[in-house]
C-alpha cells in the first residue's frame, strides 16, 4: 500500500498529491509518473498483483488474487534456441497458478484503477475500450459491486463477458471504432460531474498495474531481463515496463541496465512502427495514410488498433523506446497465427491474438539478430486460456444497455445516464 506516493510531471518535475489526477497543473502534456516513498521493492504476503502493492497507487485492497505468473520456458525456448526465455503469462491457466479469469492482463489495470478511483474520488469511472479492457473492468465490477460505465465499439460487444453477473456495469456500444468510443466516453463524462474519465494511458494505476509484469519477471529471474517483448496498441504496456524497470534500477538489487523493449503491432495497422522507423514523434494516422479505419478491419488482433496512442508525448512510447534502445516490429496475420500455434504446441495453452503477435515478433527478433540466444528474455503473454476458462467457469455475457451512433450523446442518453448515476453513485 502506498498512501504517501506523489505524482510527478516528467517535463517540469512538479510533484502533486494524487486526486485522481491525469495532467500536470502547469499544463504540460506529458504522462504523470508515480513517485513512491519506498525506494526498494517490498513483497507483501498477498497473492497476485497485491504482492507488489508497495508500488501501486492504492491504499487498500480488493478481493482479487490474480496476477502475472512468470516461468522459465522449456518447449518454446528449445524451439527458438533461447537459453533463458521467461514467459510472463497473463490469463487463465490454473495448472500454472494463473487466475486472470477474463484471460487478459487488462485485469492488472482494472483492479488498481477502480480501487484508486474509490479512494481518490467520489465519482464513477467512464472507461473506453476496444474489448479486453472493458471485459476486465466489468469483471472487477461484478466481483466488487463498484459501478462503472463502459464504452466500446459495437464490434467489441461479443467479447464482453464475466464469470459473475455485473449489474453495476453500464455498457454502451458505439457504432464506430476504438477512437470513436474514446471520443464518446469523453463527451459522456461531461454529462454529470460525478462521471470521471478513466484516463487510459494517463491513468497511473493502469500503467503501474501493467508494470507488475516487469516486477514479477525481475523477481522470478533475479534481475531485470535483457529484453522485453510485447504486442501493443497504445504502447502503454511498453511505457509501463520501462517505468517499472527504472524503479528496479533505483532499488539497486536487480541490476543497472534497462531492458531493450521489443514492441509489435499487427499489419496492416502499424502507425507506431512506421513512426519509429523514421525516428519521429509525429504519428501519421487517418485519411491520406495507410493507417485508416479500413486498415483496422484487417488485423487479427483488434485490441492492437489505436488511432490516438500516447506515442509522442513526453514520457510516452517514443521516449520509452529511445531510453531502452528499443525495436518495433510489423507482424502479419499469417505470422501471428503460426506463432500462436507454435506457442500452444510448445507450452500447452491457447493465446489471445495479441499475444500471438508478440510471439511472432520474438521469432522475428531472433531471426534479425536483435535478440541473442544467450540473453534473458521476458515475453509478455498479454492474454490466453480462453479454451481453458470455459472448463471451469460459466461465462456470463455483458449486454449493452445502449447502442448509439458515434458523436455526442443525445438528450435521451444524457437523461438516462444521469438517472443511472443517481441510482449508483
From Swiss-Prot:
It catalyses: O-phospho-L-serine + sulfite + H(+) = L-cysteate + phosphate. Disulfide bonds: none annotated. It is an enzyme of class 2 (transferase). Its EC number is 2.5.1.76. Pyridoxal 5'-phosphate binds at residues 132, 382. Keywords: Coenzyme M biosynthesis, Pyridoxal phosphate, Transferase. GO terms for molecular function: cysteate synthase activity; pyridoxal phosphate binding. Its cofactor is pyridoxal 5'-phosphate. Pathway: Cofactor biosynthesis; coenzyme M biosynthesis. GO terms for biological process: coenzyme M biosynthetic process. Specifically catalyzes the beta-elimination of phosphate from L-phosphoserine and the beta-addition of sulfite to the dehydroalanine intermediate to produce L-cysteate. Homotrimer. Belongs to the threonine synthase family. Cysteate synthase subfamily. This is Cysteate synthase. The lineage of its organism: Archaea, Methanobacteriati, Methanobacteriota, Stenosarchaea group, Methanomicrobia.
